[in-house]
């Protein structure tokens, strides 16, 4: 199934959109009944909102765990694509989506002091787990 793309955009390179997205899922779960008819932008309508929210949240937690392990050594954004998406991103049309979503996960860890970012002399950002 297609899920939301939670991305950092060039206008806010240090943003933490994943945190806001995860919190909004909690608020939705706490305020919207499970038995509402969900009309997603992609795929078919369904009932079972809370299960879908749990599934999406778990997917991001698993991705963050894989990312933490990958960051045992310094990595660039492009170096973590396979950890987050399970494959190389070799289609130009997907590169900006993958970069933005990878940055969202990296920034989430940086904002929680679970990773650091340093910029080298060539202006390349390198991320590493703390």
Residue ranges and their predicted role:
Residues 66-130:
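C-terminal regulatory/interaction regions
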Residues 1-64, 77:
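Metallo-beta-lactamase
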